[in-house]
Amino acid sequence: MAGGEAGVTLGQPHLSRQDLATLDVSKLTPLSHEVISRQATINIGTIGHVAHGKSTVVKAISGVHTVRFKNELERNITIKLGYANAKIYKLDDPSCPRPECYRSCGSSTPDEFPTDIPGTKGNFKLVRHVSFVDCPGHDILMATMLNGAAVMDAALLLIAGNESCPQPQTSEHLAAIEIMKLKHILILQNKIDLVKESQAKEQYEQILAFVQGTVAEGAPIIPISAQLKYNIEVVCEYIVKKIPVPPRDFTSEPRLIVIRSFDVNKPGCEVDDLKGGVAGGSILKGVLKVGQEIEVRPGIVSKDSEGKLMCKPIFSKIVSLFAEHNDLQYAAPGGLIGVGTKIDPTLCRADRMVGQVLGAVGALPEIFTELEISYFLLRRLLGVRTEGDKKAAKVQKLSKNEVLMVNIGSLSTGGRVSAVKADLGKIVLTNPVCTEVGEKIALSRRVEKHWRLIGWGQIRRGVTIKPTVDDD
């Protein structure tokens, strides 16, 4: 880690310097220059039906291909959550017409560069640094999407121009946005290069009818072609103008939800060269700093001799912080942050830490094994049609002892319904989870071999377990 000890970022000299010695957390904002120079501060989800071009749009804006895994490339679908950061610039020459004065680049681009548009002068200046959470668009992966949605400030809803609207998953995703209370939505009518103008207009009417009465009502509809990069600068302009910068809490104790974790050591590495595990996630609040002592809950879960669950939180120290390829001295909420720790790498490999919560020592919430929730069920199963019937299948009521999949933060775990009333339920979780009263959870049930979203709930109270701590 170059320069990690001195508390000053030495990597990427063309970006704004971060110095821990002069850091005053109370003065930071999501648009502070030294923050957005190196990391994203706004999370935007891309949602929509499979193969409508979500990953392509992200690639057109950020230059990053979010599909990272071999099986995803072969099938051309996104399975895990993909993240990509993009910097949005605005030209400081007032004579340049909109939308040409907006531009997007990758996250390692300098904060200012001269214009290359003929007839204009001045520089492109950094105005926003956004992170795109590329959500998988398949039914089975609805859970992953709700997990990703825990850290979304706004959404781009993609609708392909060459198919009728709405496709089944489009409505399912819109329901997920409503659950997550996302208010800021841009609708992108993609693949516009494949259809005639009359078709595009006809579909525009369909989209208007489809979003009426939902959170997306009144959202701007922008026709684009992600492959040909048509109108991408309009999308950039709308991101800057229509999506307000979310209010962030920089002064609380930091908390990060782990979405990915990995072991960065190559096989055959010498013992002295071993590096600690890396956890990737989005910070909900507070600021993480290099050198800070951290705690990870629930930590290592095991059972004692009587078969009772035990949790042993992991204590460690941050040795490095990254946002894509930019190294940081401190990380603020927004975007995917990689946290290099001194945790045993075997605990982190292959996403083993997903669903855990990382934060300042002693400031993390309780660990729950049972939850009492107030819940709401959807009236109909989204996207599932019953045989011979045009309408979607009805959602059956919760029954005692049935097993559901519960999504809390980034954790998906099984839960058995132990008691149920009109709108209250008790759920015994298979895995303990670190969460708080008032948090939202999503409920899915197995329907025809797939997990389908059936509703959501809010935690009222629950049974907590005391974490065990070694005496040494």
Curated annotation (Swiss-Prot):
It comes from the Eukaryota. Residues 76-80 are annotated as: G2. Residues 457-469 are annotated as: Interacts with CDC123. SUPFAM superfamilies: EF-Tu/eEF-1alpha/eIF2-gamma C-terminal domain, P-loop containing nucleoside triphosphate hydrolases, Translation proteins. It is found in: Cytoplasm, Cytosol. It catalyses: GTP + H2O = GDP + phosphate + H(+). It is an enzyme of class 3 (hydrolase). The modification Phosphoserine is found at S16. GO terms for molecular function: GTP binding; GTPase activity; methionyl-initiator methionine tRNA binding; translation factor activity, RNA binding; translation initiation factor activity. Residues 225-227 are annotated as: G5. Residues 134-137 are annotated as: G3. InterPro entries: EFTu-like_2, eIF2G, eIF2g_C, eIF2g_dom_2, eIF2g_GTP-bd, P-loop_NTPase, T_Tr_GTP-bd_dom, Transl_B-barrel_sf. It holds the Pfam family GTP_EFTU. One of its GO terms (biological process) is translational initiation. GTP binds at A51, H52, G53, K54, S55, T56, N190, K191, I192, D193, S225, A226, Q227. Residues 48-55 are annotated as: G1. Its EC number is 3.6.5.3. The modification N-acetylalanine is found at A2. Residues 39-248 form the tr-type G domain. Belongs to the TRAFAC class translation factor GTPase superfamily. Classic translation factor GTPase family. EIF2G subfamily. Member of the eIF2 complex that functions in the early steps of protein synthesis by forming a ternary complex with GTP and initiator tRNA. This complex binds to a 40S ribosomal subunit, followed by mRNA binding to form the 43S pre-initiation complex (43S PIC). Junction of the 60S ribosomal subunit to form the 80S initiation complex is preceded by hydrolysis of the GTP bound to eIF2 and release of an eIF2-GDP binary complex. In order for eIF2 to recycle and catalyze another round of initiation, the GDP bound to eIF2 must exchange with GTP by way of a reaction catalyzed by eIF-2B. Eukaryotic translation initiation factor 2 eIF2 is a heterotrimeric complex composed of an alpha (EIF2S1), a beta (EIF2S2) and a gamma (EIF2S3) chain. eIF2 is member of the 43S pre-initiation complex (43S PIC). Interacts (via C-terminus) with CDC123; the interaction is direct. This is Eukaryotic translation initiation factor 2 subunit 3.
